[in-house]
Structures are given as C-alpha cells and as structure tokens.
Amino acid sequence: MHTTQTEIEAPGPPGPLKGTLLSPDTGDMPVVLIVPGSGATDRNGNAPSWLQASTYRLLAERLCEEGIASVRIDKRGMYGSASAIPDANDVVIDDYAADVHSWVAAIRARTGASSVWVLGHSEGGLVALLAARQSADIAGLILVAAAGRPLGPVLRQQLQSNPANAPILDNALSILDSLEAGDRVDAASIDPVLMPAFRPQDQRFLMSELTIDPAALLADYTKPVLIVQGARDLQVAVQDAEPLQRANPQAEMALIADANHVLKAVRTADLQENLAAYSNPDLPLADGVVEAISAFVHASSLNRA
C-alpha cells in the first residue's frame, strides 16, 4: 500500500500547532487524531530521558496498514509546537481540549475527511472527553489507558499502595488536599522526592485536572466510544477503566491481555520486563490493540455513512 506522510498545522493560541499526517492513498478514509499523554510526550509517544517506546508512531503506521489515516501531534509549547505559546507550562487542561477542536477543523480542511475520531491516551483521554463536549465534528472517541476516576483518588491510591512512600506520604496527601481546594503549594513545603510530581510551575495545570470526573463526562456522551485497556498496565489498572463503561454502557471495551500502559507486548507479570518496554521502540504493540481500534473505526464509520 502506498502511503503519504507530511507535516500538518493547526491554528494555535498565537503560533501554530504542528503534527504529522500519515495516510494511505485510498481516497476518503477515516482519520484518527492521537492526543498524547501527560508531561513532555511528543507526537511519536516519546519523552526525554525515560520514554522511548514510539507508541504513537507505531500505532499510526499500523492504522495506516488498516486503511485509516492519523494525525499525531506535539502539544502547545513543545517540540514542533514550541512557538504556539511562550511557556509550555502556562496551560490548563481546557487549553489542550481547545487545541483538539483546532486540530479537528484543520484535519477536515486538509483531508476532506467525513469522519475524524479522537484517540486520547492516558491523560489524553481526559483531554478527548473535554473536547468532545463541544465539538459536533468529532465522530467518536477512543479512550486508551484512560482512568475512569478523578485524578485525586487515583493518585492517593497509587501513593498509599506503595510501602516505599511511607516517609513522604503525609506530605504528598497534604499537597493533594491543598491543590484540590485550589490552593498552590510553595516549593519549600514540598519534599524534594515529590518535586517532580508537584513542581510549582505545574500546579496550575494539575489543579485544573483535579476538578474533572471523566466518568461523569462520558455518561452524557452519545456518540460511539471505544475503551482500550491493557491488562498489564501499571499506571491505569483495569478497575480504573471500568467506571468509564459503567458510566456509558453503550461504549465498547477492549481488554488487551498482554498490553502495558504504552501498549507494548508484555508477556509476563515481571516488573522489569514491563518497565523495559517503555524505552524499547523496537518492541511491537501488543496483539489486539490495532485490531480493536481498526474494527471499531471502520464499523462506526460505516454506520455514520
């Protein structure tokens, strides 16, 4: 199959947002917009120093083989979208949702696609849910490794479940309480071990995220939804995804037996094998991930026709 990969832009706050359009040359085809997860994750699914799984690039390439185009993007203020805003940290989660609207419009204008699906991975799932509230042009949602509970309870459970966190647990829970109440925490009050999670420059974004209940957002959504969850995900457990389906029983759910959080094939319960997958771009996506997304997009696109 002949494919085309090109740079694509969408209007940003003052400067442009940039991404990569990968498409099979098959005429009118569905397009999937891939919304990245948290932090400095780039359009390919990588981040400096620790995350080199190339999940979004691999997903785009596999979807292209299935006759589905994709756009994978850099967030405002980062990488190719660095000129979109002066400070990449000066954002709230609704800003990313607004960028999804801009991307959907740009994709439709560039490709003429009759259906644009929004795939949100991890934190990107929350962004996708927020964007879908106000966009008639989004055909449906694909929520991948996306938590179905508010972030506060998820973080508390993660902190409390690890005995190694005992020395910093009280400080962490106190910080969370303050942020949920809308109060910033100064650096002097944050244990150095916790600083990467609660940096003062990130707190505005974190506070915006803590206010959102993803299951409540999905409960009101009437378009097609696919929930993709890996059984070997160390960051978003299966029980974290289940509230999404309970909130919207019409949503489809694909449980992928060997997929971890970055959708890589992890054959055992070994922690080191799982973590090693985060830095291995040569490791394939887990069986069933692309198949589930492709089947959902094609079937739902036919139903829209």
Question: What is each PLM-predicted segment?
Answer:
Residues A259-L263, R267-A305:
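Catalytic active-site module of serine/aspartate enzymes centered on a nucleophile-bearing elbow/loop
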Residues M1-G27:
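N-terminal cap/lid segment of alpha/beta-hydrolase-fold proteins
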Residues G27, V32-R62:
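Short, surface-exposed "cap/lid" segments of acyl-processing enzymes
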Residues S54-A82:
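Conserved alpha/beta-hydrolase
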Residues I142-S208, I212-A215:
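Accessory cap/linker subdomain of secreted extracellular hydrolases
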Residues A88-A109:
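Alpha/beta-hydrolase active-site loop
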Residues A106-S161:
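Primarily recognizes the serine-hydrolase "nucleophile elbow" in alpha/beta-hydrolase
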Residues Y221, I227-Q229:
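Short beta-strand/loop motif that positions the catalytic acidic residue
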